[in-house]
């Protein structure tokens, strides 16, 4: 039995949207009203990240992004039937979707910076994450989202050569003309009409270099902060009580999951899609299923926080079983208040 990847993509996206709607809404409610130890800037960061995840999932449902790899090209287009008559609108949704993806990754990097400062220097944390200075981090997230969106719009906007390159392939596979759908096209090489030589298309190189640079920047931040925190945390744990050591281990486990899950599910699979055209293999693949996996990230991140962090588990128990269920919120002692006052735990 042949699996229809487009139908499977739709099913995954719908499941992810409903899951994100439930998980992220619950996370926002618990963070705002139920948790006891999550305060300060990080409280708002969790809420904003959950909201951004919801917007990402909603945009995915409207745009229905899909990708097709064909020889020296990949095609980023929409499978949306509901908005098919509004081609320009769907194009903007595709651009927005790519930008939101970049913003989500950048937001995770900001959380790593925050947690790193929590352990290194509380005064440094106050200098960078209080008052109007929080606006800087908002612009940080927006900047990288805009940069990714701009690279898609300006570098992949189809021209005559790219249209003609994938026209027959697109018609054969999807039974629709490329002129009728919201579409962006990367063609790595262009054949010179007289010499028959293949030359790199500058716009394609700029797009790939730009998007990979964004990922490298965010991952460098996360890896540096994560490794530094791990080294310093081991030393600091010696002075903590057993309860606080357990809390710190939960904290570090959350970090590991937040960086490893998107790496395995989203970032590793996307590299063959992005770089494949530059190898100019003879290939025809409906690789858009990867974009459906992207939509799973918002609910997964929410589930990680709510299942790993004790404060959320207690809040969930009280919410569904009542306040007399026996769950108790741990009191953070004075010995670690300077560290945990601004942190997730």
Curated annotation (Swiss-Prot):
Pfam families: 7TM_GPCR_Str. Keywords: Cell membrane, G-protein coupled receptor, Glycoprotein, Membrane, Receptor, Transducer, Transmembrane, Transmembrane helix. The keyword Membrane applies. The chain crosses the membrane at residues 12-32, 38-58, 93-113, 134-154, 205-225, 259-279, 289-309. Disulfide bonds: none annotated. Its main location: membrane. The keyword Magnesium does not apply. This is G-protein coupled receptor str-33. It comes from Caenorhabditis elegans. The lineage of its organism: Eukaryota, Metazoa, Ecdysozoa, Nematoda, Chromadorea. The gene is str-33.
């Amino acid at each position: 039995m042949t699996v229809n990847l487009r139908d499977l993509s739709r099913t995954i996206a719908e499941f992810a949207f409903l899951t994100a709607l439930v998980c992220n809404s619950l996370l926002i409610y618990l963070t705002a009203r139920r948790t006891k130890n999550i305060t300060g800037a990080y409280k708002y960061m969790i809420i904003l990240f959950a909201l951004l995840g919801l917007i990402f999932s909603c945009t995915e449902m409207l745009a229905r992004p899909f990708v097709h790899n064909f020889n020296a090209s990949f095609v980023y287009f929409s499978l949306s039937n509901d908005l098919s008559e509004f081609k320009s609108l769907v194009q903007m949704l595709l651009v927005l979707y790519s930008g939101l993806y970049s913003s989500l990754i950048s937001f995770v990097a900001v959380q790593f910076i925050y947690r790193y400062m929590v352990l290194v220097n509380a005064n440094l944390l106050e200098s960078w994450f209080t008052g109007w200075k929080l606006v800087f981090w908002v612009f940080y997230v927006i900047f990288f989202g805009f940069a990714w969106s701009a690279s898609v719009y300006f570098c992949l906007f189809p021209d005559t050569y790219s249209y003609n390159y994938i026209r027959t392939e697109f018609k054969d596979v999807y039974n629709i003309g490329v002129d009728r759908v919201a579409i962006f096209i990367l063609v790595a090489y262009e054949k010179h009409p007289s010499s028959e030589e293949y030359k790199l298309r500058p716009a394609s190189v700029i797009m790939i270099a730009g998007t990979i640079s964004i990922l490298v920047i965010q991952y460098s931040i996360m890896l540096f902060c994560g490794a530094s925190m791990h080294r310093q945390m081991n030393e600091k744990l010696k002075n903590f009580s057993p309860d606080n050591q357990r809390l710190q281990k939960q904290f570090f486990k959350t970090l590991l999951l937040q960086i490893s899950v998107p790496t395995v599910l989203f970032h590793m699979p996307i590299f063959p899609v992005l770089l494949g055209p530059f190898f100019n293999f003879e290939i025809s693949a409906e690789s858009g299923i990867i974009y459906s996996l992207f939509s799973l990230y918002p609910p997964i991140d929410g589930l990680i926080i709510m299942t790993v962090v004790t404060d959320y588990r207690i809040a969930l128990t009280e919410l569904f079983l009542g306040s007399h269920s026996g769950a108790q919120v741990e009191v953070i002692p004075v010995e670690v208040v300077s560290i945990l006052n601004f942190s997730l735990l």
